[in-house]
Curated annotation (Swiss-Prot):
Catalytic activity, as annotated: L-glutamyl-tRNA(Gln) + L-glutamine + ATP + H2O = L-glutaminyl-tRNA(Gln) + L-glutamate + ADP + phosphate + H(+); L-aspartyl-tRNA(Asn) + L-glutamine + ATP + H2O = L-asparaginyl-tRNA(Asn) + L-glutamate + ADP + phosphate + 2 H(+)
Summary of the function given for this chain in its UniProt record: Allows the formation of correctly charged Asn-tRNA(Asn) or Gln-tRNA(Gln) through the transamidation of misacylated Asp-tRNA(Asn) or Glu-tRNA(Gln) in organisms which lack either or both of asparaginyl-tRNA or glutaminyl-tRNA synthetases. The reaction takes place in the presence of glutamine and ATP through an activated phospho-Asp-tRNA(Asn) or phospho-Glu-tRNA(Gln).
GO MF term (any one): ATP binding
Keyword Ligase: yes
Subunit structure and binding partners: Heterotrimer of A, B and C subunits.
Protein source organism: Synechococcus sp. (strain JA-2-3B'a(2-13)) (Cyanobacteria bacterium Yellowstone B-Prime)
Lineage: superkingdom: Bacteria
Protein name in UniProt: Aspartyl/glutamyl-tRNA(Asn/Gln) amidotransferase subunit B
Similarity remark: Belongs to the GatB/GatE family. GatB subfamily.
InterPro entries found in the cross-reference section: Asn/Gln-tRNA_amidoTrfase_suB/E, Asn/Gln-tRNA_Trfase_suB/E_cat, Asn/Gln_amidotransferase, Asn/Gln_tRNA_amidoTrase-B-like, GatB, GatB_C_1, GatB_Yqey_C_2, Gln-tRNA_amidoTrfase_suB_CS
Keyword Cytoplasm among UniProt keywords: no
SMART domains: GatB_Yqey
Gene designation per UniProt: gatB
UniProt entry keywords in alphabetical sequence: ATP-binding, Ligase, Nucleotide-binding, Protein biosynthesis
Amino acid sequence: MTVAAPAKVQYEAVIGLEVHCQLSTRSKIFSSSATAFGAPPNTQIDPICMGLPGTLPVLNEKVLEYAVKAGLALNCTIAPYSKFDRKQYFYPDLPKNYQISQYDLPIATHGWIEIQLSDGRTKRIGITRLHMEEDAGKLVHAGSDRLSGSSYSLVDFNRAGVPLIEIVSEPDIRSGEEAAEYVQELRRILRYAGLCDGNLQEGSLRCDVNISVRPLGSQTFGTKVEIKNMNSFNAIQRAIEYEFNRQVKAVEAGERIVQETRLWEENSQRTISMRKKEGSSDYRYFPEPDLPPIRVTEAQKTRWQAELPELPGVKRRRYQEVYGLSVYDARYLSDERNTAEYFEAVIAAGADPKAAANWMMSDIASYLNTHKLDYPDIALKPETLAELIGLIEQGTISSKIAKEILPELLEKGGSARALVEAKGMTQISDSALLGQMIAEVLAENPEQLQQYRGGKTKLFGYFVGQLMKKTQGRADPKLANDLLKQHLDG
């Protein structure tokens, strides 16, 4: 009697993300010190953010406004009443030895965003909560990128007290791709709303991953592991893929997953153990006694909601439904607010949406990438691009001529029509004149003409090239082809 081998267990990842976003305010959350990135160490500090005795925090009103706007943009319920709490822990970059955060009454809860995956599917990811807190300082390690292995460490307190919102997702994410797209969509939304610049390299947007594995179909959560130190979207995806495989191998080998914090090492493309993961009880939260409770009125919510721009998800759908753009084109053009605003200005100036999209996604995108520029940096105004597209549609110039003059318009601006006229580049659409030029081309190439009329019709392209050369590329392509065909076959 034979016994069939048991089927191999399939596992799935259960992933939740904690995304910390520095708000784009000019001053810190509880004091007036500046928040600019890149200032010399310890030049943007004050007694409050350094936790000196006798100082009292005062909430920056702009932080509350930005936090509520973020909650509204993420479809959250805004709490009419919330409060700050002290989160106790000891680390060199935390001068007070506690962080002012929010624990049981956050400013926003129960939100969601939709992400779009590479296979075209959309998925809704829930947001558990959004809360305000202050950032810590930054440790700079000599001789290593972390404390282990460094000869000594210095502390830059410029970042201490910079306002943060922490956005905690539901454990709805199942892959590295979904996680990376979720963070990218969060970044798009916050950048559109002008709340955070979303620069991962500068640390203004930081993501911690909580991941566990379980048999596919199981409803029981496994032991979660936290991953830190990912400073790109690709790093988030790779770290999750590595950690998922590590945990599956450990489970299959009968090992116990330890609840811990692990560090993503970019050079070795692996996670390494950093420390035991703390629980909320380890932080000994209690209400912040130096700050009053926060109240958000309906009037404030209504005003701040009205100040939000059209967000990228809504814009993508509108581009597809109103302008007939593809999913890819709509996504590209709505990805950054500067791009979307330029595109809409071109359309407002009278350009065909699909033609505007084609120019922006090809020649202009190539120019921007080559010169590391953005739309506000170029001299080509939206009205001029619309004018250029109009000249092509009117038959005044060909697409080839438009591509030739585009670099000058991008660098110097000005009128497309005036430039075409100054250079004498208007399209030749006179049938009689083109017919005369075609006759000259045929007379200059008797051997090729004889071969063509002898059956070698592939030479048609040769004659097109000769005609374009004679007209300096100014011949109306369709008219030129039709007339050339008539002369060759006549």
